[in-house]
Amino acid sequence: MFVASKQADEQKKLVIEQEVQKRQFQKIEELKADMQKGVNPFFKVLFDGGNRLFGFPETFIYSSIFILFVTIVLSVILFQAYEPVLIVAIVIVLVALGFKKDYRLYQRMERAMKFKKPFLFKGVKNKAFMSIFSMKPSKEMANDIHLNPNREDRLVSAANSYLANNYECFLDDGVILTNNYSLLGTIKLGGIDFLTTSKKDLIELHASIYSVFRNFVTPEFKFYFHTVKKKIVIDETNRDYGLIFSNDFMRAYNEKQKRESFYDISFYLTIEQDLLDTLNEPVMNKKHFADNNFEEFQRIIRAKLENFKDRIELIEELLSKYHPTRLKEYTKDGIIYSKQCEFYNFLVGMNEAPFICNRKDLYLKEKMHGGVKEVYFANKHGKILNDDLSEKYFSAIEISEYAPKSQSDLFDKINALDSEFIFMHAYSPKNSQVLKDKLAFTSRRIIISGGSKEQGMTLGCLSELVGNGDITLGSYGNSLVLFADSFEKMKQSVKECVSSLNAKGFLANAATFSMENYFFAKHCSFITLPFIFDVTSNNFADFIAMRAMSFDGKEDNNAWGNSVMTLKSEINSPFYLNFHMPTDFGSASAGHTLILGSTGSGKTVFMSMTLNAMGQFAYNFPANISKDKQKLTMVYMDKDYGAYGNIVAMGGEYVKIELGTDTGLNPFAWAACVQKTNATMEQKQTAISVVKELVKNLATKSDEKDENGNSISFSLADSNTLAAAVTNLITGDMNLDYPITQLINAFGKDHNDPNGLVARLAPFCKSTNGEFQWLFDNKATDRLDFSKTIIGVDGSSFLDNNDVSPFICFYLFARIQEAMDGRRFVLDIDEAWKYLGDPKVAYFVRDMLKTARKRNAIVRLATQSITDLLACPIADTIREQCPTKIFLRNDGGNLSDYQRLANVTEKEFEIITKGLDRKILYKQDGSPSVIASFNLRGIPKEYLKILSTDTVFVKEIDKIIQNHSIIDKYQALRQMYQQIKEY
């Protein structure tokens, strides 16, 4: 009976154990599946379960028993007084209740007291301040901030003479040896454009961060990651745009941008390697520098230095997609500066300054105080007084509880704050034996404290994941310090930060008792952190996910100089808009741009705005550019008068070609003018050839064409006769009024031939009252003047007329191509598909896209309908030759169309169709895409009306143009819009 019962119990235990193992296996598989998706659990059992005894921290239990015992001995036994015992007991109970509310209270109190009562913690506060505010030896400079309590600072003065001779053996470019005998190296990293990158790609990129910390499982390494958000001022108000309206509009825009809050977000990873773990003695002392020991000691240090550099290079390789840059020394005007020291100095009070690091002098030329004179601490805020007597306020944020799981987007809202901050994450990996001991210790404490089966299962899962090498564990702490120029701004920033963190599942508040700890902890420090707990390597990688913007354009030293203008990115950082590919000033760089946006998306406003901004390129040319080429010409091929007001306000010539009305175009007069200039022989011949081909096209208008577009019935003799007559007319010294009429008069013998040259040209001749006499048979002054800075041509009237559109477009684009002579040239073609529908225009544009770069010209093609542009004969050329693509909102777009023409990803297409409201998606070959705003709120409304002309105002603008008594057309336009009731 007893045996049967025992077997039944064992069988039951076996079933339970199998069920537990099954559940644990399922749990592990679920965790692994989540981790594959970038979702990593917090093992909160490590936060408090392993450090508590009967529900309280064991150090608190032992300390309370000791204090109570001493009180009883002193009060009751010696003095027969019971009140002190009661008071101590009440204090212990109150503290215990505090633990019930916040299990970290004891640790926070202990660490905070190091700053509040330094006499109880010898030297801690003084050392912490001294490390920042005193002069330190150059290459040991920063890590006193680090203050490990298990070490003594024994770089004694007795060794100074040896240091003076041999300290250089500890130095290397980008590596600092501290007086705590640790090596420090810092890498600056670029962000990932998380807004425009697909989730799958983000997970793959983030996996490289996971791999870094799985490769470091020894406690001799520590990592300090800083996210630094620094306010910057965008001041472009001193730029000259050359034209009155351009200057007025861009001044209003630039002043608005100057008032905006722009921030620069930077990421830094500092690696520390502890050398003491590799030496036989706990600290180095003078005998290391004795003659018989120094060479061996030097050899060990050099070996460790090489190993440290190898590890940093490994990290750079693993994080190569984040564009790592080592902070090293650099030379300017013969003086050596240290980027690395500048960064550590910056962490004090967010003051940027060059940092001299002269290798011939062991002591810094400037103090390691970051430009800070004094620091004051209050309850929830602090104030920094800088050397220049400027003030900055700060506050620390304490995170009490963490969300159940971590993901790479955990701190996205923090990065988007309208505030300056330094966010430091500290991580110290544990080795495998320490991990095993930690897990066993935690398991025992869970049993003692009556922990749940769920905690036990969680611990089992953790052990399995660690054992398989999926994750590692390490000690972690953080310090988030906000900065502001005013107290009110500081309070607002704290409110926004706390709200953002709480919305992500954290429990955060402004630090009070521990604020000093957090302030000093941001300098690569564990010892001053109020709370340190264990997290997985994946958790830490999620904390430091570099989600910002890796491509911000280029502010200056572009092909034509400065950036076109500055826009604001989604994370409030500046985006320097350029059309050219990144290059150096004066270099020939492709700048052709495709602009796509539906009706109402702001396409015309954007094009007009940037056209005004490009007025600045009429100045500042490279020295190798000849004087006659130091000029800028901008041509805008318009549709439906959208740019009419803008061209007029800029002081440009707006050519309206209307059916039946003399165009003012005289190709013969233009070609004859070229013959009289100092143009090259090739340019002169080209001008004649253009007119020959144009007149031949007129003569063969009604002919049946072959597959190459050549007339079947036009004889070679007629072609030669026509060409000779055109050449004679252009090169002869004669009046070129009505040149088509003069040609017909020259062909008098053909009047009776229905297929002769006279009959062919008669429709374009005034003397014969031809149907199209208004096209080119005009006075001897051609209307197109490309010596002007800005010219607009509207094709609304003729583009849909197949009888005349091919001839007008041919002449216009031939003239434009001729004007691309090495000067800076911008050609804008709005609703490009309408112009490119003509095969000859398509040929011209295709040639421009392929060769204009060498002639210092850029072409910008814009359209509302991507489908129509795909139907153009040069769609493939557009895709290949336009490295810059700018997208505005298009709710009705088709993914396959965008992919065919612009290589758009699914994520980018989602943004185009849903996420662009007065914003652009900028995509340039070889660079990540960027979302940037061209928000024009606050700009005078009359300026905005000028940028994009509504059709209802076309006649009013016509009146202004036709009224010759109005000299300043721009001011007339401005007054017209100001008088409208809407304003």
UniProtKB/Swiss-Prot annotation:
InterPro entries: ATPase_P-typ_TM_dom_sf, CagE_TrbE_VirB, CagE_TrbE_VirB_cntrl_dom, P-loop_NTPase, P-loop_TraG, T4SS_component. GO terms for cellular component: plasma membrane. It catalyses: ATP + H2O + cellular proteinSide 1 = ADP + phosphate + cellular proteinSide 2. It is found in: Cell inner membrane. Its EC number is 7.4.2.8. Keywords: ATP-binding, Cell inner membrane, Cell membrane, Membrane, Nucleotide-binding, Translocase, Virulence. ATP binds at G597, S598, T599, G600, S601, G602, K603, T604. GO terms for molecular function: ATP binding; protein-exporting ATPase activity. It holds the Pfam family P-loop_TraG. Transmembrane segments: none annotated. It is a peripheral membrane protein. PANTHER family: TYPE IV SECRETION SYSTEM PROTEIN CAGE, UNCHARACTERIZED PROTEIN YJGR-RELATED. Component of the Cag type IV secretion system, which is composed of a wheel-shaped outer membrane complex (OMC) and an inner membrane complex (IMC). Interacts with CagV and CagBeta. ATPase component of the type IV secretion system Cag (Cag-T4SS). Acts as a molecular motor to provide the energy that is required for the export of proteins. Required for CagA translocation and induction of IL-8 in host gastric epithelial cells. Plays a key role in Cag-T4SS pilus biogenesis, especially in the localization and stabilization of the pilus-associated components CagI, CagL and the surface protein CagH. Is also critical for assembly of the entire cytoplasmic portion of the Cag inner membrane complex (IMC). Belongs to the TrbE/VirB4 family. NCBIfam families: VirB4_CagE (TIGR00929). This is Type IV secretion system protein CagE. The lineage of its organism: Bacteria, Pseudomonadati, Campylobacterota, Epsilonproteobacteria, Campylobacterales. The gene is cagE.
